[in-house]
Amino acid sequence: AFAYRDCTPYDGTFLIYKEMFAVLLYRLTRSYWKKQHICLVCEKFSSMAQDNGYYFFKHCMEKNEQSYLNKKILYIIDRKSPDYPKVSPYSKNVVPFMSLRHMCSLLAADLIVSSDSKYHAYATQCRHSIFNRYIKKKKSVFLQHGVTALKRVDSIYGKGNRSACDLFIVTNTMEEKIILDNFGYEPAEVANTGFARWDVLKDCSQDSHNILIMPTWRNWLDSVSDETFEDSTYFRNYMLLLNSGHFNEILEKHDLQIYFYLHAKFQSHLKTFHAASNRIHVLSFDDTPVNEMLMKCRMLITDYSSVCWDMLYQNKPTLFYQFDLDQYNEAHGSYIDMRKDLFGDRAETSAELFDYIEEAAEHDFALKPVYARQRSEYFQFKDQQHSRQICVAIKRRFC
């Protein structure tokens, strides 16, 4: 069988020669690089500054955590990223992706801190890269980009796998137990600190009438044609929802606005989604950062997305629309029983979902007491000092 992927700017012989030159340059200047005690920070494919990596880096720059950790903290990001201006205030500590400085910094790094696996600190999808062998030996901190509970990922991030880490950051006591029971890590390798992005997470929805609909992806629909996608239960259910006359009546009655945000893996199919109502807005991945939408909305409607935890942190409700739970469990798996352990009302049909939306609107989108109790049980702290706690955990583990 053959595996295919899109060609990248880093394919070809030029990169091979550049890597060889970087390795030679590093070896000639090793003493200079090593005394800096470099810690690299990045996000997915080193292409963003929106998630836990960025907020951790921002905190470290503004609170002088470099002195506390005795490390030179550098953020890796592609110059072409739309988020590049966000890191410009810290330009001395920003390293352009795949530059010579990036390559030498990576060779010298003591630690990689990332919201994804450490391999996102480099263009390692180019399998011929000699840098794969160097990255494999690097110590790493996995900040995560979502709470681990609703989808099984131990085959990817479990200890002993390629994307394993040396310190696994978690957000609550339930998640900590999931990691210890299923991923093979020791207690000293797991830190319950909360997410760095939660430092800036606050409820900005007081005067809002917005509901965010944010479904996650399905592995059985990954990279399929538009025709196959449009024939799926996933597409049909969301199109029926977005174009329901009854749904529009509810929106009119309670003066609500809907923002439909498709998962990044399905953005190529975004053009196939549309809604008749001017109260429903279909957003692209680049329109607004997820963090901002979660802060501005009154309620979240999702299926299995871990952003529901960001809503719970803000004391705001989530409705779970799970029309394909059995198929999802078979394909992705879960660490909890979603029929009884969720912290929000669960609907399998659009009729059930509409009833829950009306009920939530009539109660001013207050979190139900039963879910408020779960919130108080899950979170160790909600003090917006999560990046500080991550620094403490890093120092305890590595310094």
Task: Specify the residue positions occupied by each region the protein language model found.
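C-terminal amphipathic helix plus adjacent low-complexity
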Residues: 1-2, 6-14, 23-26, 30, ...
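Short acidic-hydrophobic, aromatic-tinged amphipathic segments that line or gate anion-handling sites
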Residues: 93-100, 281-286, 342-356
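Conserved catalytic-core segment of nucleotide-activated headgroup transferases in glycan assembly
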Residues: 50-57, 191, 196-272, 347-349, ...
